[in-house]
Amino acid sequence: MEDAKNNIDYSVLDRPEILMFLFHPRSESDFMPRERVGLDVSIPVGADVSIGACFHMAAKSAPNILFFHGNGEIVADYDELGPIYNQLNINFLPVDYRGYGRSDGEPTVTAMMQDCHAIFLFVKEWLDQQGYTGPLAVMGRSLGSASALELASTREADIDALIIESGFALAAPLLHLLGIDTRRLGFKEEHGFRNVDKITKIRKPTLIIHAEFDHIIPYFDGQSLFDASAAENKKLLQIPGANHNDIFARGLSAYLAAIETMVKALPT
């Protein structure tokens, strides 16, 4: 299981002129004083580097969601959502990236795509050791869709479902929207995350959630991922009237209902 990785060189995305637009890290201390919600966990991913996480656990037999957030968010931003998942009897495990929240290091694309494997192995072992027996879904929002698709495409035997929210299909349009001159850099899609290619390999139940008027990652991307998905059991949920940043406010009930329906139908 430890060797399950896509052999993709992401170094072209690690140029400073790309990283400055792609990642927006902030520390947890910049957020606000936190009332303790959930279980704070540090996940080792390399020499002297740990990733911060917060595990919101509802029950030993409840379904589990390993969650990778967007590029401007941190785990602490999900302190209010974690208990809501718990009310639905779902274990919710959001994790950060290097340089985000309580995490060490500096974020790069190469590190992000490698770290998600170390994170997955840690979470899988932690759940087993702590006696959590429910199914495990991987979920990614926005930039986090890259980590979720990387894991689902390489470790399909070890996951039970895939959830993508506000995910991108192609890298070049996203980079261009972020202000990166992809033509000048000579960037081609084969240099990118290959999200569409990856989802064609994934046959586990798949849920795609996307805002109708997403101004950062257009709804077309969600539709493209859905169309390319190899899963027989798949659903595309559009959140009407919402954009990239108010998808929770406008569609939280439908959003959570779709996730609850999916994960609670998974075999235990």
Positions of predicted regions on the chain:
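An N-terminal hydrophobic leader/cap segment in hydrolases
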Residues: 1-44
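The serine-hydrolase catalytic nucleophile loop
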Residues: 71-84, 220
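Conserved alpha/beta-hydrolase
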Residues: 85-104
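Alpha/beta-hydrolase active-site loop
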Residues: 107-129, 197
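Hydrolase active-site cap/lid region
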Residues: 147-198
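Short beta-strand/loop motif that positions the catalytic acidic residue
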Residues: 202-203, 208-210, 214
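Acidic catalytic loop of the alpha/beta-hydrolase fold
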Residues: 212-217, 244-246
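Catalytic histidine-centered segment of alpha/beta-hydrolase-like enzymes
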Residues: 242-253
